[in-house]
Amino acid sequence: MYQRVLVKLSGEVMCGEGSRGFDQSNINYLVQQIAQIVDYGVNVGIVIGAGNIFRGEELSEIPHSLADQIGMLGTVINALYLKGSLQKVGIKCVVVSQVTSLPSIRPIHYDDINLYFDAGYVVIFAGGTSNPFFTTDTAAALRAVEMGANLLIKATKVDGIYDSDPKKNKSARKLDKISYYDAISRGLKVMDMEAFSICGRYKLPIVILNFFEDGSLLRAVRGEDVGSIIMPD
């Protein structure tokens, strides 16, 4: 069992694949999955993307740095919506960010993170790394290390890592376990290189799993075989 985990979610979990905005049935499912691991007794941090609000290619006509800042604010919107949804079912939750000072958001003070966890709060990190040119994958790796997580879970719509694209190659082989070195040398695109670098440096394992498989988060937290795991070299 892992005691403290960071869950990286795509914005699509708020609306469903290929959709936009917010879909209540998807959000109810998301809350249910988070509640399972909270009830199990682990400390939970969350980083969520903003793909349900907009996608990067839609902002190609403006400078990249501005597009990234818009993306950061999109993650704040999702974080606040998720906070409200978790609180509605009795889960204590706090949103922390370095990019905004809204009344419902607290600044990131790392001395406070352990206090939040000790008090039973889920901590949602909004606003990415607070700097442009970095992905939410990198933000998840950074926040996972900063909060002292012993597992990073990337919750996706696929059930793990494959040696080639299973949509294009019916013979693609699932890799249940792989090292950071192999993941990087194979050029696997499950996370960006900056995220791999941070996790590898601090020997933080990553589980890639299908979020839409009921109970997959809980199985990962329990240390059961689910998805694919990237282990330190």
Swiss-Prot record:
InterPro entries cross-referenced by the UniProt entry: AceGlu_kinase-like_sf (IPR036393), Asp/Glu/Uridylate_kinase (IPR001048), Uridylate_kinase (IPR011817), Uridylate_kinase_bac (IPR015963)
Domain of life the protein comes from: Bacteria
Positions that bind ATP: K8, L9, S10, G11, G51, R55, T156, Y162, D165
GO terms for biological process, alphabetical: 'de novo' CTP biosynthetic process; UDP biosynthetic process
EC assignment: 2.7.4.22
Reaction(s) the record says it catalyses: UMP + ATP = UDP + ADP
Regulation of protein activity: Inhibited by UTP.
UniProt keyword Cytoplasm, yes or no: yes
Annotated localization: Cytoplasm
Enzyme class, broadest EC rank: transferase
Gene Ontology MF terms: ATP binding; UMP kinase activity
Keywords in alphabetical order: ATP-binding, Cytoplasm, Kinase, Nucleotide-binding, Pyrimidine biosynthesis, Transferase
Metabolic or biological pathway, per its Swiss-Prot or TrEMBL entry: Pyrimidine metabolism; CTP biosynthesis via de novo pathway; UDP from UMP (UMPK route): step 1/1
GO annotations of cellular component type: cytoplasm
Record: residues binding UMP: D68, T129, S130, N131, P132, F133, F134, T135, T136
Record function comment: Catalyzes the reversible phosphorylation of UMP to UDP.
UniProt subunit comment: Homohexamer.
Family annotation (PANTHER family): URIDYLATE KINASE, URIDYLATE KINASE PUMPKIN, CHLOROPLASTIC
Family in the record: Belongs to the UMP kinase family.
Protein name: Uridylate kinase
Gene: pyrH
